[in-house]
Every structure is written in C-alpha cells, then in structure tokens.
Amino acid sequence: MINKRKQFVLGLAGACVMGLAGTPAVSADLAEIQKNGVLRVAVANEIPYGYMDVNGEAKGVGPDVAKHIAEALGIKKIEWTTTNFGSLIPGLKANRYDMVAAEMAILPQRCEQVLFSEPNSSYGEGLLVAKGNPKDIHDYESFAQSDHKIAIMAGADQLEMLQALKVPESRIVTISNNADAISTVSTGRADGYAATSLTVGELASKSDKVEAAQNFKDPVVNGTPVRSWGGFTFDKDSTALRDAVNTELAKFKKTPTWEKILTGYGFSAEDAKGSFTKTTAELCAK
C-alpha cells in the first residue's frame, strides 16, 4: 500500500469537516447523490486495490469497478479522496465520503461499524522479506516460534491473524502505510512484512533490497487457510446506496469486463471465481 498522503478533494473534505463541528454526521442518501450527480469515494493508495496514479487518476480493482457502477446508477462524477487505511472507516462515519473502494476485507468486527457490498474480489496472504530471505521465513507461524519481528500496517486485518497464531505483541511492529514496509524490512527493523500476496508482490517489484518469500504457506486459523474477500464499504445509514451498488455489482460480475479488470491487476482467475464463494452475510457472521 503506497500512501502518498495526497488529498485530491481538499476543499470538499475540509467543508465536510467544518460542517461536522457542530452537528452529527448525516450520510448522503442515494437519491441525493443521484440528484447532485456526484459520488465521493475514498481509497488508501494501495496497489492494486485502490490508488491514485501519477496523473491523479483513480486506478485499481475497486476504482475501476466503482466507475462502472457509478455510470450504471446515472452518477456522472466521482470525487476521489486518499487517506491512510486506518482512517477509511472513521472517514465514512464522519461523512467525509460516501463509499470506500479499497477492496477492504469483509470482517465481522468491521461489519459492526459499517456496511459492506457483496464481495468484489478475493485474495490470499504473502510475506515481504529482505533480499535472499536471510532468516529463511516462509510463513506467519514462524514469528510465534522465534524472536523474529513481523511488521503490519495499522488497521490491517493481518493483526487478527497474528493474534490468532499466538504471535506476541512484542514481536509485532506497526507501520502507518505500505510505503514504509520496504525500509522497515530492508533495515532490519522487522524481519518480515505481512500483507496480501498482491501487495507483497507490488512492493517487491519496487526495490532490489526486498523480495516476496518463496514457497509461502498461507496461515491456517481455526483449521482453515486464510483467504480474504474484499468489497465496497459504506456508512451504516447508507443502506439504499449499498443496495443499489449490490444490484449493479451483481450484473457487472457476470460480464467478461469485470474479470478482465481483476486479472489486469494481477488477480488470478481463481481469485475472481473465489469472490463468488462467500456472501457478505456469511463473512459478517461471528
């Protein structure tokens, strides 16, 4: 996740924050969004899930699919915001944007705070290590059985995985964004960085000081290999918008264009098929 901390709608976000100072946040409803012709969408600058390119254009699986959905809903304009991953949900709850297109993993604890669409993607885990993998680490479980330290991004669901694997807190290094992962691992502050396989691959391609751990073994939690399902995220009051997105998403996922978007960003055909294997209701259930 490469976080450039760049805000592309400063005026809009600032106005929202000022308006929130004295009154509770009230999410825009679908009818209002369609009337105004503007959908406010946030990403966390995580390649390939949702990010802004050097030209200021929204890219990634989430944004590309969101553009098709917005068009289908008759919404002519999307105003994009970038923020840290850990700020995505608070920003939704504060009405700084209407929707998040970051392929955020659908998890029970998140479902208590926000609404999710049905899954748009599925993806597995990976591990970023120093070049040559000097500590010979190939799984998350190793960090529970040694003195090695593992880094994670603040707000990411890898924390729950590591806790389930009994990795002590003293061995977990929290960083603010994916951009810091390369230096964190290459300088030895941590011996590995836990993230999705796609994120790890993207980071490894940016520096010859790190690499993706080969022969990585997916973490097994409660007897089940870990796989995540990502979707669009909404405030709890945005039921109509969520439902409308679900309707259009279901239609779009039946087209070859949808799968082409996923595979174009490095998802496998199996990842695309995997998005159909779970419902949001199942993923939100404890």
Give the positions of each predicted feature:
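Ligand-binding cleft/hinge of the Venus flytrap
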Residues: 52-54, 66-76, 144, 156-176, ...
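Flexible hinge/capping segments at coil-to-helix
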Residues: 131-149
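Extracytoplasmic small-molecule ligand-binding "clamshell" domains
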Residues: 28-103, 112, 264
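A ligand-binding cleft/hinge motif common to bilobed small-molecule-binding domains
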Residues: 87, 103-112, 161-164, 191-226, ...
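Periplasmic-binding protein-like
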Residues: 122-126, 207-246, 269-286
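Ligand-binding clefts/hinges and TM-proximal coupling segments of bilobed small-molecule sensing domains
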Residues: 157-172, 213, 246-286
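Extended ligand-binding regions for polar small-molecule ligands
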Residues: 63-72, 133, 141, 156, ...
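Short helix-initiation/N-cap motifs at beta->coil->alpha
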Residues: 78-90, 135, 172-187
